[in-house]
């Protein structure tokens, strides 16, 4: 049986190159005959034409409606587990608002950390990485007592807790000394810290500081959960610090991510932040059972990242930075915007949509995007 030349069939149809390659791959996969292949390509071309936008299409308005309408069906609940029973994250409408506002500090920062092959297959090795990441405080591995009479703090190490974390008494002693900038003595009761300033206030201040001293891990990572997914162990964290976690031994930073979009922007740049906005918004909508075409979200992400910096959708970002005075005033803070523009003597050239609707002029969208030219003279 002679091989069908699919290229000769496809060359008559003006598909984008990537679409042509995809169709060709599918035709080769199923080994269709020439007549069958032609019918399939014709069907694909009809679908392609049906999906093309009309000139002058209001892409922004359609995107706003397509995200906004499903948004009305989203729940207001803030906490729920995201596939991990022990970790709560913000979902639903509050999370979508967080994404579009590009909050620097999301209410429930969380990371998904994937490991290098030698650590991902073995639970004990995954636990080692988790210990290096999770914040371990002095109070987690020792009992802390205060001797008011002698102005001394006694730290009684818990041998089992230290062993679980892969620490020794020497490690604990060294960290306490660094934190309080003082000598630590080993006594029968435990590790003794003598307070230099003999006052109750100084003693209690040192006690509070010692309790919250991190002796291992990152202080931003409150908790780490290990889960087996398919054939590898994955770490989920409560808290986020992408920059430091990328340097932790055993972490596969090419597959590690956080739900803090601003942190992604600072560490990996604007293109990574754009992808994070798209992924997070899609995941939030899908978790609620809502289906939105990814291209609407891509348009929003493009607008938020177009200047090479993250801008929120709102009066402190995209909406507030419009050149038109009337467009800014129509969004929020009407009086303030009009007053400021009047004081500065600004002019509005009425180039956008909002301002033209306000003054009752045709807008540059759809049929209003073309200008008719009257041909004078000629045949009557």
Swiss-Prot record:
Main location (coarse class): cytoplasm
Molecular function, one GO term: DNA-directed RNA polymerase activity
Residue runs in coiled coils: none
Subcellular location: Cytoplasm
Summary of subunit composition and partner proteins: Part of the RNA polymerase complex.
Function, as annotated: DNA-dependent RNA polymerase (RNAP) catalyzes the transcription of DNA into RNA using the four ribonucleoside triphosphates as substrates. Forms part of the jaw domain.
Record's protein name: DNA-directed RNA polymerase subunit Rpo1C
Organism from which the protein derives: Archaeoglobus fulgidus (strain ATCC 49558 / DSM 4304 / JCM 9628 / NBRC 100126 / VC-16)
Gene name in the database record: rpo1C
């Amino acid at each position: 049986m002679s091989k069908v030349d699919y290229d000769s069939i496809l060359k008559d149809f003006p598909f984008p190159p990537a679409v042509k390659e995809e169709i060709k791959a599918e035709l080769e996969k199923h080994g269709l005959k020439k007549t069958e292949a032609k019918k399939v390509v014709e069907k694909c071309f009809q679908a392609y034409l049906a999906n093309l936008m009309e000139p002058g299409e209001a892409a922004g308005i359609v995107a706003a409606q397509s995200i906004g309408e499903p948004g009305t069906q989203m729940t207001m609940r803030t906490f729920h587990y995201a596939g991990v029973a022990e970790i709560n994250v913000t979902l639903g409408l509050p999370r979508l608002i967080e994404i579009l506002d590009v909050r620097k500090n999301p209410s429930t920062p969380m990371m998904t950390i994937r490991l290098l092959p030698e650590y991902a297959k073995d639970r004990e090795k995954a636990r080692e990485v988790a210990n290096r990441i999770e914040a371990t405080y002095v109070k987690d591995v020792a009992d802390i007592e205060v001797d008011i009479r002698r102005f001394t703090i006694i730290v009684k190490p818990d041998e089992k807790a230290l062993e679980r974390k892969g620490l020794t008494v020497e490690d604990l002693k060294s960290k306490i000394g660094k934190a309080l900038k003082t000598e630590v003595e080993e006594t029968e009761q435990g590790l003794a810290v003598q307070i230099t300033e003999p006052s109750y206030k100084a003693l209690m201040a040192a006690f509070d500081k010692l309790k919250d001293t991190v002796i291992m891990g990152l202080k931003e990572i409150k908790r780490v959960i290990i889960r087996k997914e398919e054939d590898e162990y994955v770490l989920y964290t409560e808290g986020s610090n992408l920059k430091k976690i990328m340097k932790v031994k055993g972490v596969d930073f090419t597959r590690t991510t956080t739900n803090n979009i601003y942190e992604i922007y600072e560490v990996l740049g604007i293109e990574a932040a754009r992808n994070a906005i798209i992924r997070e918004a899609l995941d939030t909508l899908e978790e609620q059972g809502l289906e939105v075409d990814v291209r609407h979200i891509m348009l929003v992400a493009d607008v938020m990242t177009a200047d090479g910096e993250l801008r929120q959708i709102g009066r402190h970002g995209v909406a507030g930075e419009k050149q038109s005075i009337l467009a800014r005033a129509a969004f929020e803070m009407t009086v303030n915007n009009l007053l400021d523009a009047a004081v500065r003597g600004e002019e509005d050239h009425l180039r956008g949509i909002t301002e033209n609707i306000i003054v009752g002029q045709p807008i540059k969208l759809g049929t209003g995007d073309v200008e008719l030219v009257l041909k004078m003279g000629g045949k009557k």
